[in-house]
């Protein structure tokens, strides 16, 4: 019986008429596939109910953040919001590859009108006035509302005390009825666009007037305190960011120092005052662009568990505390760290001895702030007494520790808000190319001061250039007279005058090409040619200086030599060896002849050493020859002429030594010192000694030579116009 019932049921399932009955019962908006299913865009049981599925309501943000959803019976479509444009069809659905992209309205010319600037935002844009102009609508406005940027009538207001006072009072009056949080929000908004000097002053005064105490914020929620502190940090950033430097520089230096100090002091104190609103341990960080802040609030007994340090963009600071004698665990303690990335230029180091005397370069150049300014403050030092502060600051410009002097300093200011940099209580612990580490025994605003050897030399660049030009003109005149002398007078012709003559010719060519071609860098090939000629003739001059030293050494030591053989070798060495060096250098690195600024050898890949190397070698050889010659001459005079006093002997040798220094080119050793130390002193010594080398050679080899004096006497004696002068 059971089997008969099962067979009957199974056969009913296989009955095709049954499937037909099911499909006939489906809703008009449903499809039949064994069962009734509502079509896409509808929802229900498929038989009695298939109503429209409103995707715009059931799937939040189905079209994405930048599009509107429009529902219709059985479906939906998306449209981009105003301020966005579709990269496909105007109407689209999710996941069909279409997206909404921001329209940059600022690409349209003069979108905001004359004397204004367009700022594109995601989905919109906004306008602000250019510096020197103002709008009745405020710092930000939309165009086509009758708003024009007109010339700011108060652009010079900061120079007049009465005008400044009126503007400050007007600003304060507008904020009289605002709460602390509302005031800081308004200041942030008003300072977010370009400011004039008088507005910088006005909004700093507005911030200072926001007197805070714990009662003002104790009832605020954590979120409200966070928002207020954020508005404070952004307001400070708006006042000191890089774009505002040009306006700060228009303010009198003393007044500028006063208001910057006031701002630093207020930012620190108000942040600590606002942190009193936190009822639980809190960590907070605000990044506002050029100003960043980190804040820690905790109970005093938890101080050891909380890191009293901050690391911000490669700058770090850490506080070391000691145990309080009378511990007070009531209330909370806050520690705030503030870093100002661009304020250093506004706090120019004073010329007081406490700062300026630290550098051996300071007397010749400017001391600069070469780091961000970092500040640290504690709300209650009685519960958290300070031991010391250690910090590492990143240099604004990389330094050479061997040439640039850095010191750890802090901004010391009085209750009258007048401040200056001081070194008291701070020591430098470590320095490298990019960072300086310090340790101080107090809290305040810290920075790294630097006196740069290169910066000092730049200050003397024009003077050194004029000395070089004048010296070379004088040297060229003197060298031409030397060449005439050694070439014209036959009675003085010998090996020594031949060497003198070739040395003078090489120096003349080198200095002449230097004078007319060193700055001709506009045409690369011509500049490379000038650099190659300078390389050759300066090396030739050094080679003949070396020959001077060797020849004098042979004479003093008393070596007998073949004059003809020696002459041939002298010429080969004097002109051949420089040619070999230049040929090899040009083959291996021809592209390093000439730079974008001067027609000389490039320092890339140490190519400059193709000149410095041979020059240093010759200087060392001549220094050795110089020492031997002076020693031999002194001993010879002492033995052969005992009647001459020791003092006279030394004085005679000194005169000869000075002459030899210039003839042998030993003064070029100042160039080596300049490369090693690059100080103002070595720059002047090198410039004076070498641009006037031709003049000194003329004085010592011609003017002070008795034989040449006699030759000139005979020459002028035969000239009637000059004879009377010689009588």
From Swiss-Prot:
GO MF assignments: calcium ion binding; G protein-coupled receptor activity
InterPro entries in alphabetical order: EGF-like_Ca-bd_dom, EGF-like_dom, EGF-type_Asp/Asn_hydroxyl_site, EGF_Ca-bd_CS, GAIN_B, GAIN_dom_N, GAIN_dom_sf, GPCR_2-like_7TM
Keyword list, A-Z: Calcium, Cell membrane, Disulfide bond, EGF-like domain, Membrane, Repeat, Signal, Transmembrane, Transmembrane helix
Modification comment: Autoproteolytically processed at the GPS region of the GAIN-B domain; this cleavage modulates receptor activity.
Record topological domains on the Cytoplasmic side: 489-496, 557-568, 631-654
Location within or outside the cell: Cell membrane
Residues the UniProt record annotates as site (Cleavage): 443-444
SMART domains: EGF (SM00181), EGF_CA (SM00179), GPS (SM00303)
Signal peptide range: 1-19
GO CC annotations on file: plasma membrane
All copies of domain EGF-like, residue ranges: 52-90, 102-139
Family of this protein: Belongs to the G-protein coupled receptor 2 family. Adhesion G-protein coupled receptor (ADGR) subfamily.
Protein name, as recorded: Adhesion G protein-coupled receptor L4
């Amino acid at each position: 019986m059971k089997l008969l019932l099962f067979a009957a049921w199974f056969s009913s399932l296989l009955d095709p008429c049954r499937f037909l009955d099911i499909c006939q019962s489906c809703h008009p908006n449903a499809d039949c596939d064994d069962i009734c299913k509502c079509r896409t865009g509808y929802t229900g049981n498929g038989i009695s109910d298939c109503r429209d599925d409103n995707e715009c309501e059931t799937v939040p943000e189905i079209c994405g953040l930048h599009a509107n959803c429009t529902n219709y019976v059985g479906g939906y479509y998306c449209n981009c919001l105003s301020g966005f444009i579709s990269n496909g069809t105007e109407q689209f659905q999710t996941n069909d590859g279409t997206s909404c992209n921001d329209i940059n309205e600022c690409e349209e010319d003069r979108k905001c009108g004359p004397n204004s600037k367009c700022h594109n935002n995601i989905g919109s844009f906004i306008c602000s006035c250019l510096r020197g102009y103002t709008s009745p609508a405020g710092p930000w406005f939309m165009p086509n509302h009758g708003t024009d940027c007109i010339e700011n009538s108060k652009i010079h207001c900061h120079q007049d005390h009465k005008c400044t006072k009126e503007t400050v009072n007007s600003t304060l009056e507008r904020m009289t009825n605002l709460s602390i949080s509302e005031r800081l929000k308004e200041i942030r908004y008003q300072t977010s666009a370009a400011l004039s000097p008088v507005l910088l002053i006005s909004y700093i005064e507005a911030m200072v007037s926001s007197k805070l105490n714990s009662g003002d914020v104790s009832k605020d929620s954590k979120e409200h305190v966070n928002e207020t502190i954020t508005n404070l940090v952004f307001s400070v950033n708006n006042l000191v960011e890089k774009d505002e430097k040009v306006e700060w520089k228009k303010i009198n230096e003393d007044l500028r120092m006063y208001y910057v100090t006031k701002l630093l002091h207020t930012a620190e104190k108000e942040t600590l005052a606002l942190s009193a609103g936190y009822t639980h341990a809190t960590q907070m960080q605000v990044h506002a662009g050029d100003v960043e802040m980190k804040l820690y609030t905790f109970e005093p007994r938890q101080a050891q568990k909380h890191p009293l340090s901050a690391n911000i963009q490669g700058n770090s600071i850490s506080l070391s505390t000691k145990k309080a004698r009378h511990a007070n665990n009531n209330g909370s303690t806050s520690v705030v760290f503030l870093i100002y990335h661009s304020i250093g230029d506004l706090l120019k180091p004073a010329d007081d001895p406490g700062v300026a005397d630290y550098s051996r370069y300071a007397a010749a150049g400017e001391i600069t702030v070469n780091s961000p300014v970092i500040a640290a403050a504690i709300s209650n030092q009685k519960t958290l007494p300070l031991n010391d502060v250690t910090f590492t600051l990143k240099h604004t410009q990389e330094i050479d520790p061997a040439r640039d002097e850095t010191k750890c300093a802090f901004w010391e200011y009085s209750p009258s808000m007048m401040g200056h940099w001081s070194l008291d209580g701070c020591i430098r612990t470590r320095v490298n190319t990019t960072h300086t580490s310090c340790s101080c025994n107090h809290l305040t605003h810290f920075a790294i001061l630097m006196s740069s050897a290169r910066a000092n030399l730049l200050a003397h660049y024009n003077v050194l250039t004029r000395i070089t030009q004048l010296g070379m003109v004088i040297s060229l005149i003197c060298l031409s007279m030397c060449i005439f002398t050694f070439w014209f007078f036959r009675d003085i012709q010998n090996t020594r005058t031949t060497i003198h003559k070739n040395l003078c010719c090489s120096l003349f060519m080198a200095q002449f090409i230097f004078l007319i071609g060193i700055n001709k860098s506009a045409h690369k090939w011509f500049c490379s040619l000038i650099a190659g000629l300078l390389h050759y003739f300066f090396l030739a001059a050094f080679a003949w200086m070396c020959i001077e030293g060797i020849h004098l050494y042979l004479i003093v030591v008393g070596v007998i030599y073949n004059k003809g053989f020696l002459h041939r070798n002298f010429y080969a060495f004097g002109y051949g060896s420089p040619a070999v060096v230049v040929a090899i250098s040009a083959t291996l690195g021809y592209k390093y002849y000439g730079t974008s600024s001067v027609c000389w050898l490039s320092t890339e890949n140490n190519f400059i050493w193709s000149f410095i190397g041979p020059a240093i070698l010759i200087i060392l050889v001549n220094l050795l020859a110089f020492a031997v010659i002076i020693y031999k001459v002194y001993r010879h005079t002492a033995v052969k002429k005992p009647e001459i006093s020791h003092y006279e002997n030394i004085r005679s040798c000194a005169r000869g030594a000075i002459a030899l220094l210039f003839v042998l080119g030993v003064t070029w050793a100042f160039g080596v010192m300049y490369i090693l130390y690059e100080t103002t002193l070595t720059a002047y010594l090198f410039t004076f000694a070498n641009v006037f080398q031709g003049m000194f050679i003329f004085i010592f080899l011609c003017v002070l030579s008795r034989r040449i004096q006699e030759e000139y006497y005979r020459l002028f004696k035969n000239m009637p116009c000059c004879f009377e002068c010689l009588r």
